[in-house]
């Protein structure tokens, strides 16, 4: 029997409808009480002092780089194996991304890769550390090394909620951590994101810049003891604020974040148990506990022993009704970055090896055991 299994599926089985209805009934749909509540609850969850909700993970990355003073002439280290947003926000500010390779087994920038890149690339202002797939990078080593060189760290945690490293949540490590709440992420607001930092000055800058550079947002003005229309513009900011309708969904998602993560881990364990004996597949390597991984992605690599090319594999999976994806076509292969910076595939050997065979399998909380059996059976039939 042919099943129809999408690559991603949102779980809105909690209080999403109730909280959205509360917002609609309130008559206040833009940034207000629900957004502030989500910021408070999210910062408490990850152990950061301050949180600033925005309308996308890309906006979070942009604000983070702006807050640390990134501008024309600056250089920011970015892995080639990431989504374009990680690099494009560098260009928004007139700075230049400098691209590096990643570890083959984890897709992470390791301390060794980072040290080599920073020692051979002069005047790097900041590093974008991507916690790929839901697994945290080795922040306990990366942080002190970067700080010893005066290099700032922005964590791209679009995949990494909730993730831990050595007992600490992602969101409690570096200068600023940026999360995404896009529709296919581990928790969602449809579109949305969050910055978390322990630095009050950075937080205040992000909060001002997310709404046109205005020193007081409308909810602050409305809720103040002496309600006032008056405000000041202290910088040319952006329109990045999160509306309360989105925040309402986020609050409901956050309530069940632990359960959602556990269910994704269940799927990951099923894949490991049922695909580990296939020598034509390289499974993702988990460096810490399975329970510390957010499991946003389960990305396999069809290695040199696979008789079926990656693109044909995706086509055959689709014929069986199974959605898959690719994470990612590397940035050094994208026309803009390749041509502007003269990037060559041979300078990114691990990324190239990953890219040629990587396929992301469905992994979401409502994926049933029957569907997981069907996916694994289909993979075996295709690869032989």
PLM feature segments, named:
Residues 1-29, 231-234, 362:
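N-terminal "arm"/small-domain region of PLP-dependent enzymes with the aminotransferase-like
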Residues 28-75, 89-93, 99-101, 168:
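Phosphate-binding glycine-rich loop
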Residues 35-40, 48-51, 112, 126-130, ...:
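PLP-dependent aminotransferase class I/II
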Residues 82-87:
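Conserved coil-to-alpha-helix start sites within the AMP-binding
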Residues 93, 148-149, 320:
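Helix C-cap/helix->beta junction micro-motif
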Residues 96-106, 325:
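Short beta-strand->loop structural element characteristic of the AMP-binding/adenylate-forming
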Residues 105-189, 194-202, 309:
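Active-site phosphate-binding strand-loop segment of PLP-dependent enzymes
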């Amino acid at each position: 029997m042919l099943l129809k299994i999408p690559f991603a599926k949102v779980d809105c089985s909690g209080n999403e409808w109730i909280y959205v209805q509360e917002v609609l009934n309130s008559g206040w749909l833009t940034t207000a009480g629900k957004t502030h509540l989500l910021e408070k609850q999210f910062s408490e969850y990850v152990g950061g002092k301050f949180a600033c909700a925005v309308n996308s993970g890309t906006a979070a990355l942009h604000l983070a780089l702006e807050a640390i003073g990134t501008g024309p002439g600056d250089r920011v280290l970015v892995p080639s194996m990431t989504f374009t947003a990680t690099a494009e926000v560098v260009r928004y500010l007139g700075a230049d991304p400098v691209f590096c390779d990643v570890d083959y087994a984890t897709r992470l920038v390791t301390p060794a890769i980072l040290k080599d890149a920073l020692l051979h690339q002069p005047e790097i202002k900041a590093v974008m550390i991507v916690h790929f797939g839901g697994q945290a990078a080795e922040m306990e080593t990366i942080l002190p090394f970067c700080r010893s060189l005066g290099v700032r760290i922005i964590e791209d945690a679009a995949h990494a909620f909730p993730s831990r490293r050595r007992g600490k949540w992602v969101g409690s490590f570096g200068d600023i951590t940026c999360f995404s709440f896009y529709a296919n992420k581990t928790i969602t607001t449809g579109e949305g994101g969050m910055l978390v930092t322990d630095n009050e000055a950075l937080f205040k800058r992000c909060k001002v810049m997310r709404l046109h550079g205005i020193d007081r947002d409308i909810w602050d003005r409305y809720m103040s003891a002496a309600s006032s229309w008056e405000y000041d513009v202290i910088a040319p900011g952006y329109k990045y604020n999160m509306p309360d309708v989105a925040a309402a969904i986020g609050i409901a998602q956050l309530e069940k974040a632990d359960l959602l993560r556990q269910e994704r881990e269940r799927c990951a364990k099923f894949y490991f148990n049922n695909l580990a004996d296939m020598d034509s597949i390289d499974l993702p390597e988990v460096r810490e506990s399975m329970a510390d991984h957010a499991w946003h992605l389960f990305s396999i690599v069809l290695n040199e022993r696979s008789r079926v090319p990656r693109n044909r594999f995706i086509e055959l999976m689709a014929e069986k009704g199974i959605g898959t994806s690719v994470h990612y076509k590397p940035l050094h292969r994208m026309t803009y970055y390749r041509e502007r910076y003269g990037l060559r595939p041979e300078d990114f050997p691990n990324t190239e090896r990953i890219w040629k065979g990587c396929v992301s399998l469905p992994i979401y909380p409502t994926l049933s055991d029957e569907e997981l059996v069907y996916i694994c059976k289909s993979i075996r039939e295709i690869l032989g």
